[in-house]
C-alpha cells in the first residue's frame, strides 16, 4: 500500500540567560556611546547622543527576541510497500526543509530508498536482500559557536541592551557601500553576515548493500554480504568586501570525495540440544574493507 505523511514543527529561542536591563550603555554610571558595556547610567528615558551622534531616548531592547526568527521545519514522506509472492518491495521518498530561527540559515534533505527481499529455490533455501539509498543534503549558513563574529548568539548577548539591533537591518551603508554597524573597524553586523558572509555545503550520498544467504540444512547456512557508502561534498564560502573581516572579500570552493566498500562472508552452524540439553553455535567468516 501507499502511505503519505507530513509534519510541521516550529522553533524559537526558549531559554536564555538573564540580563540586567536597569543600566544603559557605558561604565561606572557614565554613558559612553562607543562602549560595549552596559554599566552606564540607569535607564530612565533620558535623551542621549547615540553612537551616530543622534539624539535618542535611552531605553531597553530585547535584541534576542527582535533578531531571531521563528524557525519552521517541514517533513513530507511518501512510502510504498507491497508483497509480490515471495518478494517484498519497499520504497520511500522523504523531503525535509528547515528554515532556522537564525536568519539566513537553511537546511534541506531529500532521501530516496528502495529495498527488495525475496526467497527462492528448492524449499526456499535461497534468500536475497538488497537496498539502495540516495541522500541529497543542502545546508546554507550553518550556525557557528564560540568566540567568533559569525556566532550571532554571542553578538546579541554582548551587544549593549540600549541599542536596537533592528536599526541595522539595512546592512549596507548607501553612502559608502560598506557594512553598516555601530562599531567602526570591528565586529560584524549579523544582518550583513547573513547576506554577505555566507557558506554552503551540498552533499550527494549513495548507500548500497545486499546479502545472499543459503540454508544447507536447518542448522547450517552461509551468507555473503556487500555494501558501499560513498558521498561527494561541495563546499562554498563567500565573503563580500566592505567589512572588517576582509578589505577585498574572498571566495573559496572545495570538493570532498569519500567511499567505503565492505565485503564479508559467514558460515553459521547452530544446533540445539545435540548433547542432551546442551546446544551450541559456531561461526566462521571474514571481512574486507576498502576506504578512500
Please name every model-derived segment.
Residues 1, 60-67, 71:
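Periplasmic N-terminal accessory/gating domains of Gram-negative outer-membrane beta-barrel systems
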Residues 1-5, 73-75, 94-99:
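A beta-strand signature from Gram-negative outer-membrane beta-barrel systems
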Residues 17, 36-38, 66-70, 80-84, ...:
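Outer-membrane beta-barrel initiation region
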Residues 3-58, 102-105, 111, 115-205, ...:
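Surface-exposed loop/interface segments of Gram-negative outer-membrane beta-barrel transport/assembly proteins
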Amino acid at each position: 500500500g501507499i502511505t503519505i505523511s507530513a509534519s510541521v514543527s516550529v522553533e524559537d529561542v526558549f531559554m536564555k540567560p538573564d540580563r540586567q536591563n536597569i543600566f544603559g550603555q557605558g561604565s561606572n554610571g557614565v554613558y559612553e556611546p562607543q562602549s560595549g558595556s552596559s554599566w552606564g547610567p540607569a535607564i530612565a528615558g533620558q535623551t542621549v547622543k547615540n553612537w551616530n551622534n543622534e539624539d535618542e531616548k535611552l531605553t531597553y531592547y530585547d535584541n534576542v527576541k527582535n533578531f531571531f526568527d521563528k524557525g519552521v521545519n517541514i517533513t513530507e514522506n511518501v512510502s510504498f510497500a507491497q508483497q509480490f509472492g515471495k518478494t517484498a518491495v519497499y520504497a520511500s521518498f522523504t523531503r525535509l526543509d528547515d528554515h532556522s530561527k537564525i536568519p539566513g540559515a537553511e537546511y534541506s534533505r531529500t532521501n530516496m530508498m528502495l529495498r527488495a527481499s525475496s526467497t527462492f529455490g528448492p524449499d526456499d533455501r535461497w534468500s536475497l536482500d538488497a537496498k539502495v539509498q540516495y541522500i541529497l543534503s543542502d545546508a546554507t549558513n550553518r550556525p557557528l559557536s564560540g568566540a567568533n563574529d559569525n556566532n550571532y548568539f554571542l553578538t546579541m548577548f554582548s551587544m549593549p541592551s540600549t541599542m536596537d539591533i533592528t536599526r541595522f537591518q539595512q546592512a549596507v551603508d548607501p553612502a559608502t557601500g560598506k557594512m553598516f554597524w555601530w562599531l567602526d573597524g570591528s565586529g560584524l553586523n549579523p544582518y550583513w553576515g547573513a547576506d554577505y558572509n555566507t557558506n554552503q555545503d551540498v552533499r550527494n550520498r549513495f548507500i548500497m548493500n545486499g546479502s545472499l544467504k543459503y540454508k544447507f540444512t536447518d542448522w547450517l547456512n552461509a551468507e555473503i554480504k556487500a555494501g558501499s557508502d560513498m558521498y561527494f561534498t561541495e563546499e562554498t564560502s563567500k565573503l563580500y568586501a566592505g567589512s572588517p573581516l576582509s578589505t577585498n572579500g574572498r571566495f573559496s570552493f572545495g570538493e570532498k570525495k569519500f567511499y567505503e566498500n565492505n565485503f564479508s562472508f559467514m558460515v553459521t552452524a547452530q544446533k540445539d540440544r545435540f548433547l542432551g540439553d546442551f546446544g551450541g553455535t559456531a561461526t566462521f567468516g571474514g571481512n574486507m574493507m576498502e576506504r578512500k
